[in-house]
Regions:
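Residue(s) in the substrate-gating loop at a strand-loop-helix junction
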Residues: 157
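Substrate-binding pocket helix/loop in short-chain dehydrogenase/reductase
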Residues: 113-114, 118-126
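SDR active-site lid
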Residues: 190-256
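Canonical Rossmann dinucleotide-binding motif of NAD(H)/NADP(H)-dependent dehydrogenases/reductases
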Residues: 4-39
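Active-site-adjacent segment of SDR/Rossmann-fold oxidoreductases
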Residues: 34, 162, 183-194
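The beta1-alpha1 cofactor-binding region of Rossmann-like NAD(H)/NADP(H)-dependent oxidoreductases
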Residues: 45-46, 76-87, 119
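Active-site helix of classical SDR
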Residues: 137, 173
Length: 289
């Protein structure tokens, strides 16, 4: 039996999928600031390059970002391609001598009534949000248990902990990620590998404005539905994630209001069910105007 000893980011090697924007880019910034070497993996190679360049300058282009301590390199990666994910992991292990942290973060969303989704859209969100995470785990986990150390960090959502009508396909995939992460965590505990699942409420990234069907306003839906004035800052979330990984926490749920919502879901699921149904009705009426 090997106790879990979370890797110290200083000197660690990490891969961040979806690292070219949003939460992924914030994770890259936090990891490099902490001294890690980060492979910024993204389907959009130009975005990955931009993030890698920004975080490895004397001071990040983002105002108020911490001074640089680590390094970064870009890589083009389609997480739906299992062979490509495995090849990247093997390449990193070969060139860096190992992989300490794998952040399976890439994701997409659709918002609107479920009957509007085409089968291609269903398959796309499953391929990226579920299979993409599975491909990361399949490639990195065996290496980590062979070494007896490492951390898998899976980006889910509050939509993976609570029902979320009108983003049903997204919530389904994020429930799958939560189930994968918490179940694998039980297996990995005696093998020295930590597994942490990240479940934020609305984060201030471009995904809030993507995947909209038939007039669905994703940004308003998330903010009004969660009763907040502004979405969570991705850099604040990234700091919480690294703290959660360092503490070998099973779940990172942010912000505080999201943790309260999660508790309500567990304590009063019937009440939550009625609240969500009422909010779906309100959102539909607002979209119809």
């Amino acid at each position: 039996m090997t106790a879990v000893r979370p890797p110290n980011p200083a000197g660690a090697t990490a891969i961040v999928t979806g690292g070219g924007s949003g939460i992924g880019a914030a994770l890259v910034r936090a990891l490099v600031a902490a001294g890690a070497h980060v492979v910024v993996a993204d389907l959009d190679l130009a975005a990955a390059r931009r993030v890698a360049e920004e975080v490895t300058t004397t001071r990040s282009a983002r105002a108020g970002a911490p001074a640089v301590a680590g390094s970064a390199e870009p890589a083009r990666l389609d997480v739906t391609d299992a062979e490509a994910v495995s090849a990247l992991v093997e390449q990193v292990i070969s060139s860096r001598g190992g992989l300490d942290m794998m952040f399976a973060n890439a994701g997409i969303t659709w918002g609107g009534d479920t009957e509007l989704l085409s089968l291609d859209q269903w398959n796309a969100i499953i391929d990226v949000n579920v299979r993409g995470v599975v491909h990361c785990v399949h490639a990195a986990y065996p290496h980590m248990i062979a070494r007896g150390s490492g951390a898998l960090v899976l980006t889910a959502s509050m939509g993976g902990l609570c029902p979320a009508g009108l983003i049903t396909s997204y919530a389904m995939t994020k429930h799958a990620v939560v189930g994968l992460g918490l179940s694998l965590r039980a297996e990995a505990a005696d093998r020295g590998v930590g597994v942490t699942v990240v479940c934020p409420a609305a984060v201030d990234t471009a995904i809030l404005d993507k995947g909209q069907l038939d007039g669905f306003d994703g940004r308003r839906f998330y903010l009004d539905g969660q009763g907040v004035r502004r979405p969570l800052d991705p850099d604040r979330l990234a700091a919480s994630v690294l703290a959660g990984v360092a503490g070998n926490r099973a779940l990172v749920v942010e912000p505080v209001r999201a943790r309260a919502t999660w508790r309500l879901q567990r304590l009063a699921p019937g009440l939550m069910d009625r609240m969500i149904a009422r909010y779906v009705r309100t959102s539909r009426a607002s979209t119809a105007r």
